[in-house]
């Protein structure tokens, strides 16, 4: 079924270039998806190069296994990039990786396939899990969460200003029958939204918040960034593409913190080893955005932000 839905890789050339790939280098693609970045990176690697891909999505893993069968330099692992530290240590690669790429968010095939339950535009089962075999679905959360919990998810993760109003409408309606379909939930949210933003579906922010919560996306990102830093060799590159302000803020603060030194906010007279004050990352250039040409070809790239850093120690 995944072959039906096309995915256009965002910031493809820019991301691969930012990794500054060496022919014999070892690289991690923490968000394999449909393999756009991985295939482009493999083209830059020589016979001694290695690429390890991660993804939670079973359909992405199928694509990854096909690529691994074609190219012996590539290996795919069905794990969240939050767990890349465990995988890297198990393979004896900690501190030896030359570059890590994280392309965050949900892919076009996931959004466009109604059966995955991510979209408010196409009716399908209310699921939203990147890996349908793990965790609770969006329908289960909506069925069991309190009104306050639902409102918090919409407000904190979706940045939805009418979160309380929407949560109240959901709890009232679920007393009659459970929410099982995306269109059903989207309709109730839409009615509860009194001020639609021009050009934006009124369910957009609530669905984003629900998806982020169901998949623990921000928690995974924080763990993944820490693990990526430890996996990198000195001189290795960390390249992260984010798609909304919550993700980008985490990435920006992480890179800034390690570019200043981990003890930057501590009093200088504390008995702390001076090395703690030394930066671990160097920020490379300014944040990059999709070009006008890419925006025309792929409107979903409009919110993409890419940040790049190099490991110093």
Swiss-Prot record:
Subcellular location: Cytoplasm
GO biological process: rRNA base methylation
Residues holding S-adenosyl-L-methionine: 35-37, 55, 81, 103, 110
Catalytic activity: cytidine(1402) in 16S rRNA + S-adenosyl-L-methionine = N(4)-methylcytidine(1402) in 16S rRNA + S-adenosyl-L-homocysteine + H(+)
EC number(s) given by UniProt: 2.1.1.199
Keywords: Cytoplasm, Methyltransferase, rRNA processing, S-adenosyl-L-methionine, Transferase
A GO molecular-function descriptor: rRNA (cytosine-N4-)-methyltransferase activity
Gene Ontology CC annotation, any one: cytoplasm
InterPro entries in alphabetical order: RsmH (IPR002903), SAM-dep_MeTrfase_MraW_recog (IPR023397), SAM-dependent_MTases_sf (IPR029063)
The protein's enzyme class: transferase
SUPFAM superfamilies: Putative methyltransferase TM0872, insert domain, S-adenosyl-L-methionine-dependent methyltransferases
Similarity comment text for this entry: Belongs to the methyltransferase superfamily. RsmH family.
Protein task: Specifically methylates the N4 position of cytidine in position 1402 (C1402) of 16S rRNA.
NCBIfam families (UniProt xref): 16S rRNA (cytosine(1402)-N(4))-methyltransferase RsmH
Listed name of the protein: Ribosomal RNA small subunit methyltransferase H
Upper lineage: Bacteria, Pseudomonadati, Pseudomonadota, Gammaproteobacteria, Pseudomonadales
